[in-house]
From Swiss-Prot:
GO MF, one example: 4-hydroxybenzoate polyprenyltransferase activity
EC number: 2.5.1.39
Key words, A-Z: Cell inner membrane, Cell membrane, Magnesium, Membrane, Transferase, Transmembrane, Transmembrane helix, Ubiquinone biosynthesis
Transmembrane parts of this sequence: 22-42, 45-65, 91-111, 114-134, 139-159, 161-181, 212-232, 236-256, 267-287
Listed name of the protein: 4-hydroxybenzoate octaprenyltransferase
Organism lineage string: Bacteria, Pseudomonadati, Pseudomonadota, Gammaproteobacteria, Alteromonadales
Organism: Psychromonas ingrahamii (strain DSM 17664 / CCUG 51855 / 37)
PANTHER family documented for this protein: 4-HYDROXYBENZOATE POLYPRENYLTRANSFERASE, MITOCHONDRIAL (PTHR11048:SF28), PRENYLTRANSFERASES (PTHR11048)
Record-stated family: Belongs to the UbiA prenyltransferase family.
GO CC terms of this entry: plasma membrane
HAMAP family cross-referenced by the UniProt entry: UbiA (MF_01635)
Location in the cell: Cell inner membrane
Membrane topology reported for the UniProt record: Multi-pass membrane protein
Class of this enzyme: transferase
Reaction catalyzed: all-trans-octaprenyl diphosphate + 4-hydroxybenzoate = 4-hydroxy-3-(all-trans-octaprenyl)benzoate + diphosphate
């Protein structure tokens, strides 16, 4: 079959999740947080463009390698059985080629940045590649995802400021904790299928304590975000934004009250608003 026919192009779009931008947005927001803090509200346009493009490319690469890693189990999960690899619309070889194309283009973008950013990028690529395989070996794959989704933070800060002060690691910690919380919501959707096929997740690990642990993670992220605002001497608008974030977290808790799959997925999607509100608070907080 022609590698570039309409059916194949659609399969590649789905492999890269271009049709589902939520993951790109969840990766973009903390990257923008880091850029705005590193630049005190006025990031370099070139760095902003490079990292915005890099977020799209590396999230796409992560999705492709995730589907490659899960190609033999996705067919047994209701939500994923129609993905390109289990449905036969794309091959494993095509997925690997697509992954390397995306990774290479991402690295070419990184090469336009300073040496510290380039050095950090190697760990980022390793995390992106490793995460999909972790759900077979650890009950905390969401922690590895948190590391992978947070690595753009020190990279973006390094690109803008050519330094990694302590505040970077506060943002880093916030995002890891937030990622574990929202990806546990995502994992709650697949919990029954994952138990059947032996895939591990925090949704399974937390079991009946899932809601309270998610709430504690969300509360911890808010406390650290408040500390960040105090250290950066941000104005009152930022702290109003955090109150809104607290309201969004409360709404998510109400949504997942009965652990209904559709509601859990909706709560996961709502985290896009969390990321946006924090960014808006930072944007206005530096004015």
């Amino acid at each position: 079959m022609n590698f570039f026919c309409k059916e194949k192009r659609q399969a590649y779009v789905e492999l890269m999740r271009i049709n589902k931008p939520i993951g790109t947005l969840l990766l973009l927001w903390p990257t923008l947080w880091a850029l705005w803090i590193a630049a005190q509200g006025f990031p370099d346009l070139g760095v902003l463009i490079v990292f915005s493009a890099g977020v799209f490319l590396m999230r796409s690469a992560g999705c492709v390698i995730n589907d490659f890693a899960d190609r033999n189990i996705d067919g047994f999960v209701e939500r994923t059985k129609h993905r390109p690899l289990p449905s036969g619309r794309a091959t494993s070889t095509e997925a690997i080629i697509l992954f390397f194309i995306l990774a290479i283009v991402s690295f070419l973008l990184v090469l336009t940045q300073n040496s510290l950013t380039i050095q950090l990028s190697f760990a980022g690529l390793l995390l992106a590649f490793a995460y999909p395989f972790m759900k077979r070996f650890t009950q905390l794959p969401q922690l590895v995802l948190g590391l992978a989704f947070s690595w753009s933070i020190p990279m973006a800060f390094a690109a803008q400021a050519n330094a990694l002060p302590a505040v970077v690691w506060i943002i880093f910690a916030v995002n890891i904790i937030w990622t574990i919380a929202y990806d546990t919501l995502y994992a709650m959707v697949d919990r029954e299928d994952d138990l059947k096929i032996g895939v591990k997740s925090t949704a399974i690990l937390f079991a009946s304590n899932d809601k309270i642990i998610i709430a504690l993670l969300q509360l911890t992220s808010l406390i650290l975000l408040s500390l960040l605002g105090w250290l950066e001497d941000l104005n009152w608008i930022y702290f109003i934004a955090l109150l809104v974030v607290g309201g969004l977290f409360l709404r998510q808790q109400l949504q997942i009250k009965n652990r209904e799959k559709t509601a859990c997925f909706k709560a996961f999607l709502d985290n896009n608003y969390v990321g946006f509100v924090i960014f808006a608070g930072l944007f206005l907080g530096y004015l």
